[in-house]
């Protein structure tokens, strides 16, 4: 097989126009809003998960930080549903694109930092210089803390991109091996298929965990600045 290993990660286009904006709207079709007095089982499960995540993630925040509840819940649902849809055959996962993940990380990170400098300027500046620092080390520590601050959105985006991309590559490789071995040894092919099935279950868990980790880190940045 001469297929490019990274071909599934190329953004699909129609007549040279990217279809990424259309793909991003797909999660809205899954997370439907209730139109009746009594919601169905899927909507009940959806609301239960939202309440559970909200309780775990927003308990540590003050009144000002809790104004971000809707934003953070929308973020985790969007990333989780996008990752899960990307596991379907012949689909595309937008979160494998570093540019898109950076586009999500930078505005959220910048919003928390701006909030901190606007509401608690002295405390925000104090993060650049830990208490009790020796005088000769002050310039170096300020530079290090500044670099670590600006690396935060990049780390958010790279972590999500790397984990989702690595999982898709493993599924692609083991799936190709299963197909190739089916004409050689059915026993080995069955074993490989079993590994592929277990890996797919693992990727479903990773898809949801990475959405939770991304949102949790944004929540921690918000907690430090609110």
UniProtKB/Swiss-Prot annotation:
Keywords from the UniProt entry: ATP synthesis, CF(0), Hydrogen ion transport, Ion transport, Membrane, Mitochondrion, Mitochondrion inner membrane, Transmembrane, Transmembrane helix, Transport
Cystine pairings recorded for this chain: none
A single BP term in Gene Ontology: proton transmembrane transport
Single GO cellular component term: mitochondrial inner membrane
Record's subcellular location: Mitochondrion inner membrane
Transmembrane segments: 6-26, 68-88, 97-117, 138-158, 164-184, 195-215
Catalytic reaction(s) noted: H(+)(in) = H(+)(out)
SUPFAM superfamilies associated with the record: F1F0 ATP synthase subunit A
Subunit structure: Component of the ATP synthase complex composed at least of ATP5F1A/subunit alpha, ATP5F1B/subunit beta, ATP5MC1/subunit c (homooctomer), MT-ATP6/subunit a, MT-ATP8/subunit 8, ATP5ME/subunit e, ATP5MF/subunit f, ATP5MG/subunit g, ATP5MK/subunit k, ATP5MJ/subunit j, ATP5F1C/subunit gamma, ATP5F1D/subunit delta, ATP5F1E/subunit epsilon, ATP5PF/subunit F6, ATP5PB/subunit b, ATP5PD/subunit d, ATP5PO/subunit OSCP.
Protein name: ATP synthase F(0) complex subunit a
Species lineage: Eukaryota, Metazoa, Chordata, Craniata, Vertebrata
Gene transcribed to yield this protein: MT-ATP6
